[in-house]
C-alpha cells in the first residue's frame, strides 16, 4: 500500500482547525507561540499528503495566517505579539514558507 494512502486527509484539516490543541496553528494563532518543532512536523508530513484542491487551499490558508501573525507582531497598533519572536524565527518561517509553497 502506498504511504500516501495511510495518511489521513485530515492532517491538514486538523491544522486548519486552530482550536485543536497541540497543532502548529493552535500554538501560533491561539497561544501566540511559534512552535518550530510543530511546524517542522507539519512540513515532514507534506510529501505524504495527496495534492488536492482542498489541501492546496489549506496550505495557502496556513501561509496567509502565519504571515498575518508576523505582520501583526510588527504593527504597533496591533495587540497581537508572538511571545517567542526573534529575527531568527521569522527568517526560519521564510524558509518554511518556501517549502509549503511547493505543495500549492
Annotated model-derived regions:
Residues 1-43:
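Short terminal alpha-helical segments
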